[in-house]
Amino acid sequence: MTLAGQTIAVIDYGMGNLRSVSKALEHVAGGKQVIVTADPAVVAAAERVVFPGQGAMPDCMRELDARGLRTAVLAAAKDKPFLGICVGEQMLFEHSDEGNVPALGVFAGNVKRFPDEKMHLPTGERLKVPHMGWNEVRQKPHALWSGIADGSRFYFVHSYFVEPADLALVTGICEYGVPFTCAVGRDNIFAVQFHPEKSARDGLQLLKNFVEWQP
């Protein structure tokens, strides 16, 4: 029987590419078991928790509540090593302009859409939304960047980004028409807008750092 201290729970609320996330985690798990789960009890028993997400924010919030997982997510965010990915990062904030919906409110701040009037290069060439593809991340000090060079490229697919009220949360910045926050961290929580599971060696290194992290 697997001990709780050996498990990494990947929260399944029907809105993420969970196979890619779980396979990447298994690659770096070092003997810990990766469990994809919609069971709040399994989330509560896990040593650490990964909260992925993709799709529209209103759908993500609705599905999270429909599966009775809100309380489990909020509890895990208080006291376990916790990694949010993509919409899983956005849902940690108070509100999203996508559908004008309230989110979980773990962090103060909002989720904003890329501003159309800023979506161009200095040459005048238009930038497409969603922001899709590889882009450089400028780091701010955090244990989860260990072994990853500043300016490394990660894979993004998104039209919205977080705007924290407290800039001390910001652990990574990217630029696409405008500079935007692409990673946040506080205490036991680290969350990223990009997809580490799709980001080759550096993405796997970040996941490995999370698996080993003792905040």
UniProtKB/Swiss-Prot annotation:
Single Gene Ontology BP term? L-histidine biosynthetic process
Principal localisation: cytoplasm
- Out of the domains of life, which is the source? Bacteria
Residue ranges constituting the Glutamine amidotransferase type-1 domain according to the UniProt record: 7-215
Localization, per the record, is: Cytoplasm
According to UniProt, the reaction catalysed is: 5-[(5-phospho-1-deoxy-D-ribulos-1-ylimino)methylamino]-1-(5-phospho-beta-D-ribosyl)imidazole-4-carboxamide + L-glutamine = D-erythro-1-(imidazol-4-yl)glycerol 3-phosphate + 5-amino-1-(5-phospho-beta-D-ribosyl)imidazole-4-carboxamide + L-glutamate + H(+); L-glutamine + H2O = L-glutamate + NH4(+)
State one molecular function term (GO).
glutaminase activity
Binding partners and assembly = Heterodimer of HisH and HisF.
PANTHER family in UniProt = IMIDAZOLE GLYCEROL PHOSPHATE SYNTHASE SUBUNIT HISH, IMIDAZOLE GLYCEROL PHOSPHATE SYNTHASE SUBUNIT HISH 1
Protein name as catalogued: Imidazole glycerol phosphate synthase subunit HisH
Q: Which organism is it from?
A: Dechloromonas aromatica (strain RCB)
